[in-house]
């Protein structure tokens, strides 16, 4: 049962990342390979503030606007100039940015492992016999609330409806008078908030190191592919399922194979969809 609880916690972290990733993927039309590094950058900014004696959750709030500015700046400096570029160009550009951010993190924070100063971590013993820490309870509650608010935002607000319109057909949205760059801006902010949250929660639940960006991206991308690009429901289900699979696999496999589970999920999902496409 402990593996099940751990899987739900990890799944919630993946859900935060995959939800932000799939929103931007659907809106901009390409998988941003730098998203894992943005998650990690937000976590390291939070770590820097936390190291000054600021409580970790307050540090997270302070790191959010900095991470948002970084995400928007990257888009304005690079991707805005490539809006009409082909898919391979956009992917290569995002790969270059991911390498730059990874190098930046290594230069500023070094190559070692870092831990957040969370303080005492009280534990709760559940009726099923598993143990969950208070920070893990917060991670689950935060993730549920964030995803619920995002669902309401996309379904009930004008900005959310405009976001769906731009994601469906950017040309028609322009003809209808929707300011697509404004929509991109606000969704970058949302994506950055989800990214920094997921990165920080992973650091709280385990640790941080400069190579974690790719390890973050793999499960996030796998959950997005599994749940269908652009589908928040799919990102939610895919993230939870992948988190549970990764943790339950630790019963039989070494924890070193966890990133391989995400990669395997991507390959299997693409294979199944290709077979179904050919049959259809």
Regions found by a protein language model. Give the residues of each.
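Membrane-embedded helix boundary and interhelical linker motif in transport proteins
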Residues: 5, 27-73, 77
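Pore- or pathway-lining transmembrane helices of multi-pass membrane proteins that form conduits
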Residues: 37-41, 82-106, 213-225, 241, ...
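Cytosolic-side transmembrane-helix boundaries in multi-pass membrane proteins
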Residues: 108, 168-175, 179-182, 252-280
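Alpha-helical transmembrane segments within multi-pass membrane transporters and channels
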Residues: 21, 54-97, 104, 237-242
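Transmembrane helix-bundle core of multi-pass membrane transporters
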Residues: 81-156, 183, 248, 253, ...
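Helix-loop-helix "hairpin" substructures at the membrane interface of multi-pass membrane proteins
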Residues: 127, 131-208, 234-237
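Inter-helical junctions in multi-pass inner-membrane proteins, predominant
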Residues: 1-13, 132, 153-158, 185-224, ...
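Membrane-interfacial amphipathic/re-entrant helices at transmembrane-helix boundaries
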Residues: 1-16, 45, 56-59, 85-94, ...
């Amino acid at each position: 049962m402990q593996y099940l609880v751990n899987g739900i916690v990890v799944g919630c972290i993946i859900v935060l990342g995959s939800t932000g990733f799939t929103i931007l993927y659907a809106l901009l039309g390409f998988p941003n390979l730098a998203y894992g590094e943005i998650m990690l950058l937000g976590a390291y900014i939070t770590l820097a503030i936390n190291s000054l004696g600021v409580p970790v959750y307050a540090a997270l709030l302070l790191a959010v606007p900095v991470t948002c500015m970084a995400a928007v700046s990257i888009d304005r400096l690079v991707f805005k100039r490539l809006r009409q570029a082909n898919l391979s160009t956009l992917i290569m550009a995002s790969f270059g940015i991911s390498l730059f951010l990874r190098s930046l993190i290594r230069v500023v924070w070094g190559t070692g492992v870092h831990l957040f100063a969370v303080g005492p971590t009280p534990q709760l013993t559940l009726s099923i016999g598993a143990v969950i820490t208070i920070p893990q309870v917060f991670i689950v509650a935060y993730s549920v609330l964030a995803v619920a608010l995002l669902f309401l935002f996309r379904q009930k607000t004008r900005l959310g409806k405009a976001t769906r319109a731009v994601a469906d057909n950017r040309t028609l949205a322009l003809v209808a008078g929707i300011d697509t760059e404004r929509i991109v801006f606000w969704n970058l902010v949302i994506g950055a908030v989800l990214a920094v949250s997921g990165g920080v929660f992973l650091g709280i639940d385990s640790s941080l190191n400069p190579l974690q960006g790719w390890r973050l991206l793999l499960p996030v991308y796998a959950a997005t592919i599994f749940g269908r690009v652009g589908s928040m429901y799919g990102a939610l289900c895919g993230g939870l399922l992948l988190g549970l699979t990764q943790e339950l696999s630790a019963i039989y496999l070494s924890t070193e194979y966890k990133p391989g589970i995400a990669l395997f999920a991507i390959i299997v999902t693409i294979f199944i969809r290709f077979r179904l496409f050919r049959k259809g």
